[in-house]
């Protein structure tokens, strides 16, 4: 009788790969090309084997079907092209680090896309996200899952069929901008005890259709559902700053968690091609409106990180925009907060991955995360063994930084989801 290999010699990813029966070749394609990187990231967070199985099974059941038909390269005549990543992939991975020994978490971002997206059957790509959320509502393990905020904000900030017909008739969309109609995407936080679902909305289409300025549209929709649980003065300070400094545009995003309203934060996102320290400082302090000790301590940490990374400063948009992507920013407000929590997303794609990794390693050590700092570059190479870090510019997509009095330094690093499709410049 032949000997049996020890079951402990196989990882959860390898075990699942052996026995998975895929509904279609499309879903098998994405499992083969993207699940292994996700498995490596999950292990990086010191998840238990049971959690690895759980999260990978969730990825198979509820993430891949959102885009399984989609291919991450140009397809002539395709009616819809994803806009959530610079690599052209419809999904993105990130790891959040906070209080490093206890709190590291993987997040998966995805744009739900039906096969009919961009066609007469689903012209503004609404179908798939509704289908996904309806299915998630039946998953018993998602104990905190709640659709109240989705139902409200999807109506308040996304277009109806009538509004879309009006937009098409008036031709207010730039014809050359293939992702101009995109209005939503999703995120999945792989937390210790369950998966938390996040929604991201882009309200510019609703603003165009209704003729309502974005500042007014966002303020009204937030007050209508949160009433006074989101501090009105804090929200007004952020909205007024963004409005007065021309920060509301087609790239403005709004997000919330699909959990009970009393617990869900809200976030406002934007982008700016002025990738300079002075611009980052202005965004961090909300135009100088917040200069308290916590804000300024966070700013000092951000400056330290900024100086360690090979950032290319740009005051204006270069001719080859894709090679010099924008800086992103966000403001998070939780129920009861009297100040917003700023977050700066430093563009990592198109920067040398070895230099980025070295800069991050140094920063992690300086803030007391010695183990992470010592292991970071080796871990990155182990996830992408076929990539030469000295030549690669595709593995890091964003490096996000935040700081709060309660949590201290909070880092979120975004990565290419599949080395099979590296971003070529």
UniProtKB/Swiss-Prot annotation:
The keyword Iron does not apply. Keywords: Transferase. Homodimer. Its EC number is 2.5.1.-. This is Aromatic prenyl transferase PC-22. It is an enzyme of class 2 (transferase). GO terms for molecular function: transferase activity, transferring alkyl or aryl (other than methyl) groups. L-tryptophan binds at residues 83-84, 92. One of its GO terms (biological process) is alkaloid metabolic process. Pathway: Secondary metabolite biosynthesis. Aromatic prenyl transferase; part of the gene cluster that mediates the biosynthesis of the indole diterpenes penitrems. The geranylgeranyl diphosphate (GGPP) synthase penG catalyzes the first step in penitrem biosynthesis via conversion of farnesyl pyrophosphate and isopentyl pyrophosphate into geranylgeranyl pyrophosphate (GGPP). Condensation of indole-3-glycerol phosphate with GGPP by the prenyl transferase penC then forms 3-geranylgeranylindole (3-GGI). InterPro entries: Aro_prenylTrfase, Aro_prenylTrfase_DMATS, DMATS-type_fun. Belongs to the tryptophan dimethylallyltransferase family. Substrate binds at residues 107, 198, 200, 265, 267, 269, 345, 410, 414.
């Amino acid at each position: 009788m032949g000997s049996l290999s020890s079951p402990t010699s196989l990882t959860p990813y390898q075990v699942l790969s052996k026995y998975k029966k895929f509904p279609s070749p499309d879903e098998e394609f994405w499992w083969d090309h993207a699940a292994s990187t996700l498995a490596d990231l999950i292990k990086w967070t010191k998840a238990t084997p049971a959690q690895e199985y759980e999260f990978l099974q969730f990825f198979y059941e509820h993430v891949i079907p959102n885009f399984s038909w989609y291919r991450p390269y140009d397809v002539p005549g395709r009616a819809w092209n994803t806009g959530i990543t610079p690599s052209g992939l419809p999904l993105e991975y990130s790891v959040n680090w906070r209080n490093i020994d206890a709190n590291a978490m993987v997040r998966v971002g995805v744009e739900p896309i039906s096969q009919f997206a961009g066609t007469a059957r689903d012209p503004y790509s609404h179908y798939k996200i509704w289908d996904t959320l309806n299915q998630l509502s039946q998953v018993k393990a998602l104990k905190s899952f709640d659709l109240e905020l989705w139902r409200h904000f999807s109506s308040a900030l996304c277009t109806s069929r009538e509004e879309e017909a009006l937009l098409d008739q008036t031709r207010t969309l730039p014809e050359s901008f293939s992702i101009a109609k995109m209005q939503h995407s999703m995120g999945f936080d792989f937390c210790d005890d369950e998966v938390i679902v996040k929604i991201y909305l882009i309200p510019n289409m609703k603003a165009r259709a209704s003729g309502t300025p974005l500042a007014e549209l966002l303020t009204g929709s937030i007050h209508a559902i949160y009433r006074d649980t989101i501090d009105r003065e804090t929200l007004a300070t952020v909205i007024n700053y963004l409005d007065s400094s021309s920060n509301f545009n087609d790239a403005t995003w709004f997000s919330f968690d699909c959990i009970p309203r009393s617990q869900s934060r809200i976030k406002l996102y934007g982008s700016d091609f002025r990738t300079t320290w002075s611009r980052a400082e202005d965004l961090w302090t909300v135009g100088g409106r917040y200069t308290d000790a916590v804000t300024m301590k966070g700013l000092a940490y951000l400056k330290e990180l900024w100086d360690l990374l090979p950032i290319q400063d740009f005051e204006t948009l270069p001719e080859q925009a894709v090679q010099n992507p924008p800086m992103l920013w966000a403001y998070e407000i939780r129920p009861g907060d009297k100040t917003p929590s700023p977050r700066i997303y430093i563009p990592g794609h198109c920067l040398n991955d070895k230099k980025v990794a070295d800069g991050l390693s140094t920063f992690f050590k300086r803030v007391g995360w010695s183990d992470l700092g010592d292991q970071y570059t080796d871990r990155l190479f182990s996830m992408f063994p076929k990539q030469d870090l000295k030549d690669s510019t595709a593995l890091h997509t964003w490096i996000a930084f935040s700081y709060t009095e309660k949590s201290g330094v909070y880092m979120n690093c975004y990565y290419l989801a599949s080395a099979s499709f590296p971003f070529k410049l």
